[in-house]
């Protein structure tokens, strides 16, 4: 009868490898299997993974093993972290049927790297997110329209937002429009309000509400246009314009109990409108990027989180906060490096976000500066926008 032998504590493996620094990675892995009992016992005999081959490329060596019958997938998934401790190198593990692939990387994720125009994918909505161990990570806003961004202050959230804004403008200068809610009193994004692609920048909750009323009116109009053409998703139409609603520091829209009722009501309406964009805006060409410093059930509304299939998390202080941001722990374990993050879609990747200086951003975008007439909100937009809900009939 087969029985699974349990993995002992990691530090035993680390101590052993420390005493045997001259060993090759291949020998260390074989020894690791023995020390940690990554094996099955069958008829009194221990059966370990059998080495098949190794394949080397520029950035890694892939060790391929044949797994003995009976090792469960849960055990294999735990190997990467323990192997990294023993090899002192980044490791990725995958398995298919009974073959185990242990990919050992030669270098770590860079601690810092700079954004460049070479990263652009012209005439697409596919933008650079960051660099992982083995590849550049891009995100296609046509496939996944909404994104939540979380992380402590000074760890790269606003730099990331500016990266996205710069890439989208340079890739789609004629078709991208931005509605930006900068709740740091406009400190970060008001310098860009005169770009032709920036419709408006709201600097406080009152201005945010006025902006969202106008965005809602645009959504209502888009619904009418698409209903007449019998379309329900903008990617199936010839409409090229996409509207990005960026919220920098969404916690300032949280209707906390200590505020006056009028202010709480205003903030609640803002959150409801943003939730509505997240629910139905994707198919209409509206993309929400919602950013908050410390995610909680109040500061990251449930509808926004559930409808944002792309989630980017920079370092957070606790596993609880990481669970709120990504539905998994890990952000609390990231190194204290600005720009280091976890990006989650159908899988989770550790990445380093490229760095873009404000001066370099302006040098790239100043060609799109135009003379604008900044006006107060237009009360005529209230007719359709003030309905309680937007819905398809």
Regions found by a protein language model. Give the residues of each.
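Interdomain "pre-motor" coupling segment immediately N-terminal to P-loop NTPase/helicase cores
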Residues: 68-113
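N-terminal, intrinsically disordered, polar/charged segments of Gram-positive cell-envelope systems
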Residues: 31-34, 376-389
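Short polybasic amphipathic segments
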Residues: 127-129, 339-345
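P-loop NTPase catalytic phosphate-binding loop
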Residues: 2-24, 59-64, 68, 97, ...
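N-proximal, solvent-exposed amphipathic alpha-helical segments enriched in charged/polar residues
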Residues: 11-48
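Short edge beta-strands and adjacent turn/loop segments
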Residues: 38-62, 242
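Short, glycine/acidic-rich hinge or "gate" loops at secondary-structure transitions
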Residues: 227-236
């Amino acid at each position: 009868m087969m029985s699974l032998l349990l993995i002992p504590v990691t530090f035993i493996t680390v101590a052993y490898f420390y005493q045997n620094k001259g060993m090759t990675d291949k020998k260390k892995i074989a020894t690791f299997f023995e020390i940690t009992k990554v094996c099955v016992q069958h008829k009194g005999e221990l059966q370990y993974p059998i080495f098949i081959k190794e394949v080397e490329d520029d950035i890694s060596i892939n060790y391929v093993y044949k797994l003995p019958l009976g090792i469960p997938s849960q055990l294999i998934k735990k190997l990467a972290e323990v192997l990294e401790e023993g090899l002192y190198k980044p490791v990725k593990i995958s398995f298919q049927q009974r073959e185990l692939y242990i990919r050992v990387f030669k270098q770590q994720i860079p601690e810092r790297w700079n954004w460049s125009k070479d990263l652009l994918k012209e005439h697409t909505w596919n933008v650079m997110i960051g660099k992982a161990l083995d590849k550049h990570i891009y995100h296609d806003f046509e496939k996944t329209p909404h994104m939540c961004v979380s992380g402590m202050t000074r760890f790269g959230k606003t730099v990331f937002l500016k990266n996205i804004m710069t890439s989208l403008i340079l890739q789609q200068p004629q078709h991208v429009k931005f509605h930006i809610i900068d709740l740091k009193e406009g400190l970060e994004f008001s310098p860009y309000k005169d770009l032709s692609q920036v419709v408006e920048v709201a600097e406080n909750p009152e201005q945010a509400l006025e902006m969202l009323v106008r965005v809602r009116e645009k959504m209502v109009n888009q619904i009418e246009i698409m209903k007449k053409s019998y379309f329900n998703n903008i990617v199936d139409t010839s409409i090229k314009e996409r509207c990005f609603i960026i919220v920098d520091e969404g916690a300032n829209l949280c209707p906390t109990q200590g505020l006056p009722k009028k202010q709480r009501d205003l903030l609640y309406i803002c959150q409801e409108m943003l939730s509505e964009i997240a629910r139905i805006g994707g198919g209409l060409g509206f993309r929400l990027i919602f950013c908050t410093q410390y995610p909680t059930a109040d500061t990251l509304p449930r509808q926004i989180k559930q409808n944002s299939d792309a989630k980017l998390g920079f370092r957070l202080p606790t596993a609880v906060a990481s669970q709120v941001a990504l539905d998994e722990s890990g952000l609390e374990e990231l190194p204290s490096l600005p720009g280091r993050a976890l990006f989650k879609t159908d899988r989770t990747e550790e990445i380093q976000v490229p760095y873009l200086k404000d001066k370099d951003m302006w040098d790239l975008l100043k060609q799109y500066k135009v003379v604008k007439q900044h006006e107060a909100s237009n009360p005529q937009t209230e007719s359709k926008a003030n309905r309680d809900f937007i819905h398809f009939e």
